[in-house]
């Protein structure tokens, strides 16, 4: 079925179209609301690597996106894609997948390169404990 980042989090605020969660040791993110959860509910944000953008710098003012900084911990070239393991500022490892066809390069970043990752608020799913 594929790979998935599992980020432990707590619901901070709920709403009809979005909810705010605090990803442990990382920060606040918005996601789709989950049925039956309320502020204080613990759970996991499931986020697929192909839903995560990675760049040396991303515009911070893009509506509906969540942004975090980190550095490239490792990468794995898989032909048409490269999987980057990004170490966030708190040490959490997150996998991001980047198509190699975007620029014809096999590798965009080297180990220890500073990067930003981002995903749309509706890219992940919050799974309550």
Give the predicted meaning of each segment.
Residues 1:
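Contiguous mid-protein beta-loop-alpha structural module that forms a pocket-lining wall or clamp
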Residues 4-6, 10-129:
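Non-catalytic connector elements of ABC transporters
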